[in-house]
Amino acid sequence: MIRKAFVMQVNPDAHEEYQRRHNPIWPELEAVLKSHGAHNYAIYLDKARNLLFATVEIESEERWNAVASTEICQRWWKYMTDVMPANPDNSPVSSELQEVFYLP
C-alpha cells in the first residue's frame, strides 16, 4: 500500500456543512473510491485554521489518479465548491504532504 496525505482548506463558515456532506458520503462515490484501490481514507478538520488534513492508503498512483476522471468525482467536486476553495476544474485546492515519520 502507498500512504498519501494532503491538506485542503474549508471556508470558515462551512465547517458543519462540510462535515454534514461527508456523513455519509454518496454511496456511489464510496464505491468508486474503493474500486480504485483507496483504503482507510480519513479527513481531519483543524477548526482554528480552517484546514483539512486527509490520509489515504492506495493500491496504485494510476488507479488513485483515475478517480478524478470519473463522472461521480466530477459531480462531487462541483457539489463541494461552495464550502471550500476550488481549482478551475472544480477540484479542491490541495497540497500533498511529505511523510516524515511512520510507526507501523
Swiss-Prot record:
<feature type="active site" description="Proton donor">
    <location>
        <position position="22"/>
    </location>
</feature>
<dbReference type="InterPro" id="IPR011008">
    <property type="entry name" value="Dimeric_a/b-barrel"/>
</dbReference>
<dbReference type="InterPro" id="IPR008000">
    <property type="entry name" value="Rham/fucose_mutarotase"/>
</dbReference>
<dbReference type="Pfam" id="PF05336">
    <property type="entry name" value="rhaM"/>
</dbReference>
<dbReference type="GO" id="GO:0062192">
    <property type="term" value="F:L-rhamnose mutarotase activity"/>
</dbReference>
<comment type="function">
    <text>Involved in the anomeric conversion of L-rhamnose.</text>
</comment>
<keyword id="KW-0413">Isomerase</keyword>
<comment type="subunit">
    <text>Homodimer.</text>
</comment>
<protein>
    <recommendedName>
        <fullName>L-rhamnose mutarotase</fullName>
        <ecNumber>5.1.3.32</ecNumber>
    </recommendedName>
</protein>
<feature type="binding site">
    <location>
        <position position="18"/>
    </location>
    <ligand>
        <name>substrate</name>
    </ligand>
</feature>
<dbReference type="GO" id="GO:0005737">
    <property type="term" value="C:cytoplasm"/>
</dbReference>
<keyword id="KW-0684">Rhamnose metabolism</keyword>
<keyword id="KW-0119">Carbohydrate metabolism</keyword>
<comment type="similarity">
    <text>Belongs to the rhamnose mutarotase family.</text>
</comment>
<dbReference type="GO" id="GO:0019301">
    <property type="term" value="P:rhamnose catabolic process"/>
</dbReference>
<comment type="pathway">
    <text>Carbohydrate metabolism; L-rhamnose metabolism.</text>
</comment>
<feature type="binding site">
    <location>
        <begin position="76"/>
        <end position="77"/>
    </location>
    <ligand>
        <name>substrate</name>
    </ligand>
</feature>
<feature type="binding site">
    <location>
        <position position="41"/>
    </location>
    <ligand>
        <name>substrate</name>
    </ligand>
</feature>
<keyword id="KW-0963">Cytoplasm</keyword>
<dbReference type="InterPro" id="IPR013448">
    <property type="entry name" value="L-rhamnose_mutarotase"/>
</dbReference>
